[in-house]
Every structure is written in structure tokens, then in C-alpha cells.
């Protein structure tokens, strides 16, 4: 069962539960995770980290001290993992009887990875609903190649980004020109957020319809869109 915990201003800590055991993805803070574990009497088996930013790793130290879970992540977070727990493109791990595949998804950071779990993509800040993460590395080629890899996933793949950016991203897409589908999605997303809900997960199929970054025809178009979004 996949769930979420809200954290900081707009972060989601994604949770995967099975038979009293728990995996958390990108725990930006420990308090919400501890509360869930204690309230539901769960055993924290593993932490999956997509990249090094503090709003994705802030809770790791306390959670490790309190529960001693296995921590997996890319080389840029090796200070939080043991050598055997550093993962990269093409690797796979098994936790709680589930096979988890690791996909390279860099661009936002140098070694950003995503985790594919039974048709569910936990993509950190590499892909958002109707958007994409800032390219802090300046490596737009890698960020565009990440979009190409995501496009090849099955359309019914569920996508779990780490932030609630859907409304602002849809507003940007509408600034590029009229789009009835995007207008409808914006209205729905606004309603969900106003009620304190979560607009995620999305799907690869849906993103192919509303996300211009994912559907960029070439690197030049992708970079132009990202530059426009940076100034939006």
C-alpha cells in the first residue's frame, strides 16, 4: 500500500507498507515518519533517497539512530549510506519481497535516481506533474535524456514526485497557449489543494498530455521551456 506524509511547505514523503513493514522515500523530516510508525506499530525497513538536497534527506539521521533501517541512495548521498547501499542506473534491490529497480534521472542533481516499484515511479525532483525540476547542474542534456527515459515507460506507470507543484506548473503550461485539457486539470488541481488533498500520483499517460517538458521534441526545446519556467 502506497501512502504519503506531508512535510515542510510542499514536500511529500512517500510510504510503502506491507504486512506491518514500512519503506519511506525522501524523508525530509523525521517527526512525521516517527509519528506514523509509533501510531501504527510499524517496522521501518528501508529509506530510499533520490538525491542529496536537504528537503529530501533531513530526517535520515534521526530515523537511522532510532530504527536502524537500510538506507539506499545514489553516490551523492553516500555519506548517509554504507558502500553496499549506494545504487545507480540498472541496479535492483529487494525489500519486503518487492523488487525495486533504479533508474538514472539526473539533471536536477548530478546523480539523481528514481525508483520503479511494480509500476510505480518514485522520481524525487526529476519529474513533476506538468513540470520538471530545476536543472541545478546546468546539464540540460542529461535532464532531457531523463525525459526520454521516462517517456519509454508504460503509459499506466504511476508517478510519485516529491512536491505539490501541480497548480503552479499547470499555470505555466497555460501561459504557453490555450489548452482545454490543461484548463480542466488546473481546475481539478485547485479544488483538491483547496481541500487539503494531494494531486498525486499522476501517470506517464497523463503527463504525455499535459507536460511539455516530458514531450519536448529535442534538447533545444526542452532548454527553452526550462528557461521560460525559471523566469515565470
Where do the PLM segments sit?
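Conserved beta-strand hairpin/beta-sheet module of binuclear metal-dependent hydrolase folds
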Residues: 1-40, 113-130
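Active-site HxH/HxHxD metal-binding segment of metal-dependent hydrolases
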Residues: 8, 22, 29-102
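Core dinuclear metal-dependent hydrolase active-site scaffold
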Residues: 15-17, 90-117, 152
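Divalent metal-coordination and catalytic microenvironments
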Residues: 16, 26, 51, 63, ...
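Active-site metal-binding loops of divalent metal-dependent hydrolases
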Residues: 27-29, 52, 76-77, 107-109, ...
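Active-site-flanking alpha-helical
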Residues: 58-59, 114-115, 132, 170
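Active-site-adjacent loop/tail segments of enzyme domains
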Residues: 131-156
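Accessory terminal helices/loops
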Residues: 148, 152-158, 167-232
